[in-house]
């Protein structure tokens, strides 16, 4: 027998998650995470979580409006580090710390993906991310060149500086 109440609550939770996602600027993390998970058959939460700090860095480096919003979120979380940029970076650092605490990978390399295989799949990764509707909703929408760099930085665990 189905638990109709449980199904209803799950549906509501999924809807609320989707609505909050559309308003929270994590579209680029989803676009890149979907590409990684789709090609390398990895869990959705792991791939999106892995890309979250990289994509937030990318966004704050190119969108003043997003920087202000991310800094506001950081301050709400008690990360009052000074300027908007410092607060946003503190939030990103906290996300990385949390990933370490829960033993999640901080780079694609830590997922056990071979560098040669990664490079072989680069065109597919970029094309999937470019055509992902979640990527298109980001406050800073990357082109092919930026996505390639972002994917390569994430492979090595290098902070985004562009």
Region annotations inferred by a language model:
Residues 1-24, 145:
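Carboxylate- and glycine-rich phosphate/diphosphate-binding segment that chelates Mg2+/Mn2+
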Residues 2-5, 86, 109-112, 137-145:
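Short coil/turn segments at secondary-structure boundaries
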Residues 3, 26, 45, 115-119, ...:
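Alpha-helix N-cap/helix-initiation sites
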Residues 6-9, 28, 47-51, 69, ...:
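Residue-level detector of well-ordered alpha-helical segments, enriched
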Residues 10-18, 52, 95, 99, ...:
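Short alpha-helical scaffolding segments that buttress acidic/His motifs in well-ordered protein cores
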Residues 15-48, 132-137:
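Glycine-rich phosphate/pyrophosphate-binding beta-alpha loops
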Residues 42-119, 160:
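Gly/Pro-rich interdomain helix-loop hinge
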Residues 119-162:
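Short, amphipathic C-terminal "tail helix"
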């Amino acid at each position: 027998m189905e638990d109709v109440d449980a199904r209803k609550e799950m549906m509501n939770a999924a809807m609320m998650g989707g609505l909050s996602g559309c308003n929270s600027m994590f579209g680029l993390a989803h676009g890149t995470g979907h590409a990684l998970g789709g090609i390398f058959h990895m869990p959705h939460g792991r791939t999106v979580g892995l890309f979250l700090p990289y994509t937030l860095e990318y966004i704050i480096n190119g969108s003043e409006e997003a920087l202000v919003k991310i800094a506001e979120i950081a301050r709400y979380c008690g990360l009052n580090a000074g300027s908007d940029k410092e607060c946003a970076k503190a939030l990103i650092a906290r996300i990385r710390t949390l990933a370490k605490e829960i033993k999640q990978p901080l780079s694609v390399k830590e997922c056990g993906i071979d560098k040669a295989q990664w490079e072989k799949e680069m065109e597919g990764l970029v094309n999937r991310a470019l055509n992902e509707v979640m990527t298109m909703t980001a406050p800073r929408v990357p082109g092919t060149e930026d996505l390639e760099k972002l994917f390569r930085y994430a492979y090595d665990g290098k902070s985004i500086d562009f």
